[in-house]
Regions:
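Trp/Gly-enriched beta-strand surface patches
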Residues: 1-35, 101
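Non-catalytic terminal regions with compositionally biased, polar/charged low complexity
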Residues: 39-53, 57-186
């Protein structure tokens, strides 16, 4: 998260946040694992009306993996960050306070509570839509007619999806209408 005057930050272990295998990358935060979390108190700035995204990296190696965090173009209702890592990934993180379409970065459109896009060497590796209807980047689209939690991700050169409801996935010129499912091949 970008810095802010009057901000207090607390690190906590929250309860597990997902019960469905395949819904989160690497099945993180499934029982019995806790969810690493931060509690942020901000005087005079309500997160309900001013969104934020944070990056927290705990590491045991001699050096961190996060090389840099860059704030992306946003507006009062949408915030975005680009996170560059030592292992060659670029992660784009988006958060909004409304359910309108936003364009927080070039060639990206987003309508949801949380959006994540991961690229490696400019090639898409993952898209995650948290409680939303659409996430688009270039020729890749993840969308639904209702709010869903959904992801498309590449594992060992094969594309998979997970979703809590029906989704439409566009990859280049190919479009697939998919039902709810977890760790399903595309």
């Amino acid at each position: 998260m970008t810095g802010g005057e009057g901000r207090e930050v607390y690190r906590v272990d929250a309860p597990p946040t997902t019960m469905n295998k395949g819904l989160t990358p690497g099945d993180i935060c499934m029982p019995p694992m806790p969810t690493p979390a931060l509690i942020v108190r901000q005087e005079g700035n309500n997160a309900q009306t001013h969104p934020f995204v944070s990056v927290y990296e705990a590491y045991k190696k001699s050096s961190p993996n996060v090389l840099g965090v860059e704030a992306l173009q946003g507006d009062d209702d949408c915030i975005g960050l680009k996170v560059n890592t030592a292992d060659g990934y670029a992660d784009y993180l988006f958060s909004v306070t409304d359910m309108q379409a936003h364009h927080p970065s070039g060639h990206v459109s987003f309508c949801g509570s949380l959006g994540v896009i991961r690229e490696k060497e400019g090639k898409l590796q993952l898209m995650y839509l948290g409680c939303g209807r659409s996430l688009k980047k270039g020729n890749f689209v993840l969308e639904s007619d209702r709010d869903v939690y959904a992801a498309i991700y590449m594992r060992h050169g094969v594309w998979y999806y997970s979703a809590t409801g029906p989704v439409r996935v566009k990859m280049g010129k190919e479009t697939k209408d998919l039902d709810e499912g977890y760790n399903q091949k595309l």
